[in-house]
């Protein structure tokens, strides 16, 4: 369902076991891209340094709502024991409960203490109502980093693991995916959302062009995001079954680039690259803002768009009840029997599913070659397409295959070649006469 949210400044459109022990494949090297300590500080600052932190939850809440819909759309989903990985303030928990999920235990894991306990002082009355309605109270687990071992949760004890817009700050995605899989029961589900590589592409382009023009060099100001193909590969290599990955884009309109950067900072989504530049001149930012508005600005309301690509992923812990592909060679019928014809238009014999133009050694031969081997005069092709006009080029020769698979040079081409040879002979004779 497409949603449109309006607020001042923007417009939303369409809306110990170590992790490393779980590596399932070779040639794997952990890369450290993000400074996790800085990211924790940035998340804490969204609570301590912002007057109204809830004012900047609009993007997290929107994606959490969509992710909750996807969770409950799964047929016969079991929400008994649930882990919210990178839960922030627990927005996903709220939406899942509102949509009627039956939860026995709910664990919230977060590296930011301020963000994890942000809403505790404001929900005392809600907790009393929840107790009266027999709703589950979440168990909150604070970790130093999302890549650390989660204490207090046993292996194969969870029915569902969910994560909303947190995994894009993890350095060791393969290790974390493998570690989460160890916590799932057989047939348990892992479902998450994270930012994709097209996120904030307008901001990246504008800062790049401005810094190149004003300072003669460039350093990354927007953290790199994961490709959708990489997510699928990580799921498969960690032995998740029935992996599925899809994506959508959310576009938010802001008054200018500085409003966008302010909101990103107050969300805790500002840059956290390990080797980032600590200072950029005011002149460069002003130039970037002008470039942003010139290249991507909306003419109707003088605003600028910001694109957020959301990647959704789902994977299952293996179980014998899940669908599995048939073993190779177990088919009882040839695929061609479904239509009764081959790809060349020939019908197959009733007693055999092997086409007559294939030998027993499965080496492809043409029909005329097979007839020659049997001493039969090859039949002349009646393919009218041979006489059709063909493009004439000087850099390559065009050959045509009839539906028997035989090569045919075009008659026009043969005639043209003969004319060229005659012309060359005539020119040579005239040249000899002139020499004499």
From Swiss-Prot:
Compositional bias ranges of the Basic and acidic residues kind: 391-411, 421-436
Keyword set, alphabetical order: Methyltransferase, Mitochondrion, Oxidoreductase, Transferase, Transit peptide
Record note on disruption phenotype: Defects in development due to mitochondrial NADH:ubiquinone oxidoreductase complex (complex I, MT-ND1) deficiency. Increased autophagy.
Top-level division of the source organism's lineage: Eukaryota
Classification via SUPFAM superfamilies: S-adenosyl-L-methionine-dependent methyltransferases
Entry's Gene Ontology cellular component terms: mitochondrion
InterPro entries recorded: Malonyl-ACP_OMT, SAM-dependent_MTases_sf
GO BP terms in the entry: culmination involved in sorocarp development; methylation; mitochondrial respiratory chain complex I assembly; negative regulation of autophagy; phototaxis; sporulation resulting in formation of a cellular spore
Ranges of Low complexity composition bias in the record: 369-380
Taxonomic lineage of the native organism: Eukaryota, Amoebozoa, Evosea, Eumycetozoa, Dictyostelia
Targeting presequence: 1-25
Organism for this UniProt entry: Dictyostelium discoideum
Protein family according to the UniProt entry: Belongs to the methyltransferase superfamily.
Name of the featured protein: Arginine-hydroxylase NDUFAF5, mitochondrial
Function of the molecule: Involved in the assembly of mitochondrial NADH:ubiquinone oxidoreductase complex (complex I, MT-ND1) at early stages. Probably acts as an arginine hydroxylase. May also have methyltransferase activity.
Pfam families: Methyltransf_23 (PF13489)
Enzyme Commission (EC) number: 1.-.-.-, 2.1.1.-
A GO MF term: methyltransferase activity
């Amino acid at each position: 369902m497409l949603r449109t949210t309006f607020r001042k400044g923007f417009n939303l459109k369409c809306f110990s076991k170590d992790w490393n022990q779980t590596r399932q494949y070779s040639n794997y090297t952990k890369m450290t891209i993000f400074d996790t300590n800085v990211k924790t500080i940035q998340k804490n600052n969204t609570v301590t340094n912002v007057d109204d932190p809830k004012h900047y939850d609009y993007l997290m809440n929107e994606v959490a709502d969509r992710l909750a819909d996807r969770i409950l759309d799964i047929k016969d989903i079991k929400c008994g024991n649930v882990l919210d990985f990178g839960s922030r303030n627990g927005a996903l928990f709220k939406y899942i409960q509102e949509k009627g999920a039956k939860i026995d235990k709910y664990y919230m894991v977060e590296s930011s203490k301020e963000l994890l306990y942000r809403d505790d002082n404001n929900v005392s009355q809600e907790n009393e109502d929840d107790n009266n309605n027999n709703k589950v109270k979440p168990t909150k687990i604070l970790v130093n980093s999302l890549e650390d071992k989660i204490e207090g949760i046993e292996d194969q004890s969870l029915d569902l693991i969910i994560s909303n817009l947190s995994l894009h700050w993890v350095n060791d995605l393969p290790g974390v995916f493998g570690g989460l899989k160890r916590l799932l029961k057989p047939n348990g589900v892992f479902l998450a959302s994270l930012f994709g590589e097209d996120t904030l592409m307008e901001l990246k382009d504008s800062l790049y062009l401005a810094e190149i023009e004003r300072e003669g060099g460039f350093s990354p100001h927007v953290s790199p995001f994961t490709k959708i193909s990489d997510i699928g590969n990580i799921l498969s290599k960690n032995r998740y079954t029935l992996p599925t990955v899809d994506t959508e884009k959310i576009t938010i309109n802001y008054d200018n680039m500085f409003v966008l950067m302010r909101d990103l900072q107050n969300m805790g989504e500002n840059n956290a690259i390990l080797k980032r530049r600590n200072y950029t001149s005011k002149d460069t930012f002003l130039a970037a803002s002008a470039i942003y508005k010139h290249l991507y600005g909306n003419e109707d309301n003088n605003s600028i768009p910001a694109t957020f690509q959301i990647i959704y992923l789902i994977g299952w812990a293996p179980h014998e009840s899940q669908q599995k592909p048939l073993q190779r060679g177990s088919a009882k019928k040839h695929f061609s029997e479904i239509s009764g014809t081959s790809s060349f238009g020939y019908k197959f014999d009733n007693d055999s599913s092997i086409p007559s133009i294939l030998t027993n050694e499965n080496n492809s031969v043409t029909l005329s070659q097979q007839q020659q081997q049997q001493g039969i005069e090859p039949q002349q092709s009646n393919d009218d397409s041979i006489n059709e006009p063909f493009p004439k080029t000087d850099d390559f020769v065009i050959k045509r295959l009839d539906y028997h698979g035989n090569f045919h040079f075009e008659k026009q081409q043969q005639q043209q070649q003969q004319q060229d040879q005659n012309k060359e002979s005539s020119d040579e004779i005239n040249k000899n006469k002139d020499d004499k």
